[in-house]
Amino acid sequence: MPGTLSRRTFLANAAAVPAATLIPTGVATPARPSVTTASLIDAERGVIRSAMDGSGIGAAAVCLVEGGQVRWTEGFGHVSGQGSVPVDASTMFSIQSTSKNFAAVAVLLAVQDGILDLDAPITRYLPSFTVRSRFEHAPQERISLRLLLANRAGFTHEAPLGNNYELASPGFDAHVRSISQTWLRFPVGTRYRYSNLGFDLAGHVLEQVAGISYPAWLQRRIFEPLGMHDSTADASVYLASKVRALGTQEGHTQVPPVTPLVVSGGVWTSAADMAKYLGFLLGGGRSGAQQLLEPRLWDEMHGFGLGGDYGLGVMRSERLYGSTPVRLLHHRGGGFGFGCVFTYCRQANAGFAAMFNRATSAGYGIGERLLDQLLSARFGPRQPRVPLSSLAPIRLTQDQMQQMAGSWIGRSGKAKIGVAGNGELQLHRGAHAEGTRFAAIDGDQLFTVDTDGEVATYRYHAATDMLPAYLECSNGEDGLDQNDPIDGPTGPQAPHWQPWLGRYRVDQWGRPSMFVVLEQRHGWLYIDGIRLVAEVEPGLLFTSDGEAVDFRGSQPTWRNLRLRRVAPMGQG
């Protein structure tokens, strides 16, 4: 990449590379793997056993598809502890949010049938649906299936009924109805924010139009055609299985076996079936001689037309191996006692999945080394995509640095931007994280470089009268909302806030999950350190990252989660 990147091409060049030619493939009869692949598989077995030791993972299963063939399926551990049935390639696991990939395919099949339109307002199919917004009138009229599947409709992550915290599942219909009680975090279509609700709503639209349940649609249009006999989203089916893995979570003797998040997190499947699904995706929607999903719709799903790194139910990571730009397509899952990693790469004609019965960092590392070495063997060693010599950082003015300095909040946690001794900005993620150079090539475009030499780009969006400043990141999950600017104005310090101050508990499945403090600083309210920047009516407030905090009723909520008071301010 010779020369210096211009201001307007920087984000595009750093965040995306051309996809290689797409080579159709399918899953064929397993064949003897090459020595190289066999040795990598053998090494990965050691990685898996190491990940399971000491992490609480008692059951895991994996699959590897390469060159149109199933190279590896294997189970590890036992479905519910020592002495129970050993895990094998047919053991069923919950894949949680990896289900969103299936949801996108399910909706696109209905688009292929002509019964759904990706870009029509969802009110065409759900005329009575409404959702609350402080930014615009009738936001539902602007929400499309495309925005739902791309996490760009503005929804929060949890619903009042049926979420990752409540003990009893109210059922999918009640869960979807409760979405109308939620408040959008941002104006429709303006930002990426990961959300279960958008996918569940999209699946509900599909049910209404198709006239059958979402699990039945998956069975008829995906699982049966692909021969995925161990797969279902029907709770009555997976609960009846005597060889399904049992989810586990630290602090809980039991994890609820049924999730109300049927679309966004409800698929159960096996390693053998995931290999078949990987073959379908690597084949561009083809399975054997059958084109199940038209190529144009496969491209729609993986086209990333709205920008960022999230397409329709799939994420991308761009890498460079040797001189070859490589796109990894993936979607993780985690919750209700399970975790899943799921990655496919069409340039290498390879895909990998791992499922495990505890969502731990050790589990999410399974397969990383294997895929990296496969790609290195195919294309050459991994290289940084954007040479630092191509970047020409500038020194920001004092005013520009001042507007970015302060605390920020994002889905991946809290962050702080400060000025280092050399006069450059530093980005700190996490309470004790070392700073990373936060350099600019223009007043509103900045970048960081990670330990692998990869560039992450940010675009600064100034504050408006309704929202704080925002840093849009090429890695969508790392976007940041400004929480506390340096030398920001003093808040209104409303007297009616005083009775609410104190310490609160959020329960998950009937047990304490986290404790948060509602406090007042510099005239502003803060919950868990996040500033409440707007009060649209007495008792209804919104945080700097767009979440609703509601003290109007007898049961206060934050992010639609119930707050149980532990002690007033100054006590407990």
Question: What are these language model-derived features?
Answer:
Residues 42-48, 62, 68, 94-119, ...:
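Active-site SXXK
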Residues 118-134, 225-226:
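Short, glycine/proline-biased beta-turn/loop segments that scaffold the active-site neighborhood
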Residues 69-71, 76-80, 133-342:
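Short, surface-exposed loop or secondary-structure junction motifs
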Residues 1-18:
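N-terminal secretory signal peptides and thylakoid transit peptides that target proteins
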Residues 35-95, 115-117, 130-134, 177-183:
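Short, conserved catalytic-motif segment at the N-terminal edge
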Residues 340-358, 468-472:
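Short, well-ordered beta-strand elements
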Residues 56-59, 336-338, 413:
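Short, small/polar residue-rich loop motifs at catalytic or cofactor-binding pockets
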Residues 372-572:
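Peripheral terminal and inter-domain segments
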